[in-house]
Amino acid sequence: MNKIYLPASKMQDLETIIKESWELKVRLNQLSLDERKIIVLSGDHGVGKDVWAKLMKTKNPEIEIIRFADPLREAFEKAGIPGHSIDSLKRTCFKFSEFKVDGYQLDGMTMREALVHVAESNKVKFGQDYYAKQAIERAQKALEYSKLIVFTDMRFLVENKAVQDFAKANNLYIVRINIPEGLPKIEVLQD
């Protein structure tokens, strides 16, 4: 897949982005809900996998977006840090002071360090497939009302295996799309 180039002045309007990006328009129009399938979005950190998923969902609202990190983000939200703050704080040097998530002390850690610490601690405590199992449970429930499930953050072999096993058990076809660098950040779609 080629890089997507859009004029900076038009990066805020979803309809304009879809209209002006031939490649994006073609990809979105190729989404067929005739058969049940899984789309796995891959790409470097920060290239816009979640943005692509949201664009797909805008085009086809029946799509279910699942992130392996959702339970981790929900744990931080329960502790008082909303999702949009998580993303903002990851880009800063902010460090926690007297803060706990899921019982883990995060003093002196940046947001990224805290996310990794809680995730890895939970994997040690509950098994390496802790987050994969939760994502697959959500995907199984989503099959009751959706033919297309999009995973946006597959990072580990255990997650890949879980998705493959899930697809095989449910007779689903897996499509992998690599998101190129250069997809603009669309603030309208950010959490």
Spans of features found by a protein language model:
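Hydrophobic positions on the alpha1 helix immediately C-terminal to the Walker A/P-loop
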Residues: 52
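Post-Walker A helix-loop "phosphate-sensing" segment adjacent to the P-loop in P-loop NTPases
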Residues: 58-65
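ATP-dependent NMP and nucleoside kinases share a basic, alpha-helical "lid"
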Residues: 64, 134-187
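Conserved lysine of the Walker
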Residues: 49
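ATP-dependent small-molecule kinase phosphotransfer cores
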Residues: 70-146
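P-loop (Walker A) phosphate-binding loop of NTP-binding proteins
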Residues: 43-44
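Extreme N-terminal, non-catalytic leader segments
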Residues: 2-39
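Short, charged, surface-exposed secondary-structure boundary motifs
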Residues: 75-77, 182-191
